[in-house]
Design a protein with these regions (language model features):
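Glycine-rich phosphate/pyrophosphate-binding loops
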Residues: 73-74, 155-165, 440-457, 472, ...
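A short glycine/serine-rich beta->alpha loop
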Residues: 26, 43-52, 80-88, 131-142, ...
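Cofactor-binding active-site loop characterized by glycine-rich and histidine/acidic residues
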Residues: 57-195, 405-406, 434, 438, ...
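A short, small-residue-rich loop immediately preceding and capping a beta-strand
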Residues: 47, 83-84, 134-137, 164-182, ...
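Terminal amphipathic helices with adjacent charged low-complexity linkers/tails
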Residues: 80-81, 262-356
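Thiamine diphosphate
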Residues: 117-129, 147, 157-168, 185-309, ...
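N-terminal capping segment at the start of a domain
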Residues: 35-49, 204-207
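Non-catalytic terminal/interface segments that mediate subunit docking, oligomerization
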Residues: 330-471, 528, 549-559, 577-580, ...
Length: 715
């Protein structure tokens, strides 16, 4: 027999948890739980990869959640008022997949057999949009802890906005030792307690095991005490992992707590009842092997030599979720039909968009004025906020600095659950994951801000947002050495290049206030995460962007200046490509190049604003060639790393060192971001190209080093 847990091992099918003879229904439930344990062994074994032990230990918990507690409709997985389920310890994904299959979400037994295989719906960790019923992408430990808090904020905000008849659900989050060791869990749990978020039920799978071995190797936190200090309701239920009635009672107690989040501490035994792997690190992340599986199945009363065994009566037990969920949803639909609220606002909120015509409220900025793009965003947000019903904004202690202050909006709090202003505190990582949770909950379009350099603190959350196509908007400001005296610790250099390399993330760096308005419009209308990269310093509002940005920005790149004076005969001699605060420098440099100087002929330079590479790459070849014609030398000008610019440019004025502490204008000048220096580099590029064209045929088929003219530090 396996090593039994100290208190309550799984009762044999013939007995109830209290030792009394079990009813046929109880016997069927226990068989169902054991079938889930069997699937948790079979799928990783077939894949020769996967995490078995946690799924086995938590099978009774999953059974209680999906059959007794949670409100959901498998036939309509996106029903707005469903309870949300987040598996933060996403390595136990086979547990979730098994429940989605059994409960009728559309997964099949063949999908379970294809666990972790190319093209299957059952990936190694849960992925939003990959299979029905997966609320959010998890896997990197702790992310689900913070995303669940975001879902709790969304539920409270929407309940206050639209009423409890339409929004009345719980968020359940399962997390493990690893999740709670991660720093993001501290950030998120602290804020959840401060916000007094009820309807938020976390189950801590306290199994004392990590990959390296027992948690005592590196972890001795008093977890209940820690969460009590955060202001949570804590229920340490001990050894009841196999007692379904005790589990249900604990969950319902937690669900009744309305004024604070709840933590149920559950002592489980990873891999139980495996005779040799229970409570071992090997049970965490490896298939059990055929012999161990056979012995364990015999203990569980399953056919030892049959894989993926699901008897009809077990499938019928779990498929009761379909009519039960349909009845719950239809009752909700009746309430919705009789609701007298603002349906246009409801529809727009759940679509993550503005009301019809919202973009007509975008401000137009006066040419010639000086406006930092972070201040332009502030103006855009406040001009349109009332027409974007789901808009919620906040920052990591930089609300005013990053342009995300909603004038007149209440602070999100127990006293003002309708509050649209979230003060995340100095918790960038939690903010990022909470934004993803809000977006995937639905009904909320979150905007979150911090200094661009500190986007690094958010990076794991941003990556999951991009992977899962969460509709979130990041306001990352103070975007270059132009921020000034705070120096290189706060001056972003490599961030633009690294974030552009992230699949699924739109990175937009507007040249001035009018471009910023168009970027805000595109971000609100988007369906994926958008990062707005904005200046601290004032920038001139350009006449050229005022005329052309409304049609050009959404295409990612467009011609700002064909040639000073407007001449359009023949191709340009040179193309200057700029983003953000460097576009106006390029415009001024083009004017200098157009003027004949002593010993230098006039140069006809085109200026291109390229605010968003992702949008530009989405255009057809003809459009891209019309903006960046082939065969014309190109010089890119951007106050960040040169990495990646060889896609578009022959040379760059860029920064490949860390910055320096100095007033912003001085720092930009020292690093070469002046019209005079850009014009000088442009002439050097033209000279190099002409010299190259005179080489012999062998040299002509080669290319000069595109990086010869990169700036590497102060000039």
């Amino acid at each position: 027999m396996p090593p039994a847990p100290p208190a309550s091992p799984a009762p044999p099918p013939s007995e109830s948890p209290a030792g009394r003879p079990a009813s046929p229904e109880r016997e069927l439930e226990q068989l169902g739980i054991n079938v889930v344990r069997g699937l948790a062994m079979d799928a990783p074994e077939r894949a020769r990869s996967g995490h078995t032990g946690t799924a086995m230990a938590l099978a009774p918990l999953a059974h209680v959640l999906f059959t007794r507690v949670m409100r959901y409709d498998p036939s309509d997985p996106e029903w707005p008022d469903r309870d949300r389920f987040v598996l933060s310890n996403g390595h136990a994904s086979i547990l979730l997949y098994s429940m989605l299959y059994l409960c009728g979400y559309g997964l099949t037994l063949d999908d379970l057999k294809a666990f972790r295989q190319w093209g299957s719906k059952t990936a190694g960790h849960p992925e939003k949009r990959h299979a029905p019923g997966i609320e959010i992408t998890t896997g990197p430990l702790g992310q689900g802890v913070a995303s669940g808090v975001g879902m709790g904020v969304a539920e409270r905000f929407l309940r206050a906005r639209f009423g409890a008849d339409l929004v009345d659900h719980q968020t359940f989050v399962v997390c493990g030792d690893g999740c709670l060791e991660e720093g993001i869990s501290h950030e998120a749990a602290s804020l959840a307690g401060h916000l007094g978020l009820g309807r938020l039920v976390y189950i801590y799978d306290n199994n004392h095991i990590t990959i390296d071995g027992p948690t005592e190797l590196s972890y001795s936190d008093d977890v209940p005490g820690r969460f009590e200090a955060y202001g949570w309701d804590v229920d340490d239920v001990g050894e009841v992992a196999n007692d379904t009635d005790a589990l249900e009672a604990a969950l319902r107690r937690a669900m009744a707590v309305e004024d604070k989040p709840s933590l149920v501490v559950l002592r489980s035994h990873i891999g139980w009842p495996s005779p040799h792997l229970t409570d071992t690190a090997k049970a965490h992340g490896e298939p059990f092997g055929e012999d161990e599986i056979r012995e364990t199945k015999a203990i569980l009363g399953l056919p030892p030599d049959e894989s993926f065994w699901v008897p009809d009566e077990v499938l019928e037990l779990y498929r009761r979720a379909v009519p039960r969920g349909r009845a719950l949803r239809r009752a909700w639909e009746e309430r919705f039909t009789s609701w007298n609220g603002d349906r246009h606002a409801w529809d727009a909120a759940w679509a993550g968009r503005g009301l019809s015509g919202w973009e007509r409220k975008l401000p137009e900025f006066e040419v010639g004025t000086q406006v930092a793009t972070r201040k332009a965003l502030y103006a855009c947000i406040n001009a349109t906020a009332d027409l974007i019903p789901g808009l919620v904004a906040g920052a990591a202690d930089l609300t005013g600095n990053t342009g995300v202050k909603l004038d007149g909006a209440a602070r999100q709090s127990p006293e003002h659950p309708e509050g649209r202003q979230v003060y995340f505190g100095i918790r960038e990582h939690a903010m990022g994951a909470m934004m993803t949770g809000m977006a995937h909950h639905g009904g909320v379009l979150p905007v979150g801000g911090t200094f661009f350099c500190f986007s690094d603190y958010m990076r794991p959350a941003v990556r999951l947002a991009a992977m899962s196509r969460a509709h979130v908007i990041y306001s990352w400001t103070h975007d270059s050495v132009g921020l000034g005296e705070d120096g290189p610790t706060h001056q972003p250099i490599e961030q633009l290049a690294s974030l552009r390399a992230m699949p699924g993330l739109v990175v937009a760096r507007p040249a001035d206030a009018n471009e910023c308005a168009q970027v805000w419009r595109a971000a609100v209308d988007a369906t994926e995460p958008t990062a707005l990269i904005l200046s601290r310093q004032d920038l001139p509002v350009l006449a050229q962007t005022a005329a052309r940005a409304p049609g050009g920005v959404a295409r990612g790149g467009y011609v700002v200046v064909d040639e000073p004076g407007g001449a359009r005969t023949g191709p340009p001699d040179l193309v200057l490509i700029g983003t953000g605060s460097e576009v106006h420098v390029c415009v001024d440099a083009a004017a200098l190049l157009a003027a004949e100087q002593a010993g230098a002929e006039a140069v006809r330079a085109r200026v291109v604003s390229l605010p968003c590479w992702e949008w530009f790459e989405a255009q057809d070849d003809d459009y891209r060639r019309s903006v960046l014609p082939a065969g014309i030398p190109r010089l890119a000008v951007e106050a960040g790393a040169s990495f990646g610019w060889d896609r578009y440019a022959d040379a760059t004025v860029a920064i490949d060192t860390f910055g320096a502490s100095a007033p912003g204008a001085r720092a930009l000048a020292e690093f070469g971001f002046t019209p005079e220096h850009v014009a000088e580099r442009a002439r050097a590029l033209l000279a190099a190209r002409r010299a190259h064209d005179t080489h012999d045929a062998h040299d002509a088929h080669g290319t000069h080093d595109a990086h010869d003219t990169h700036e590497g530090g102060p000039s």
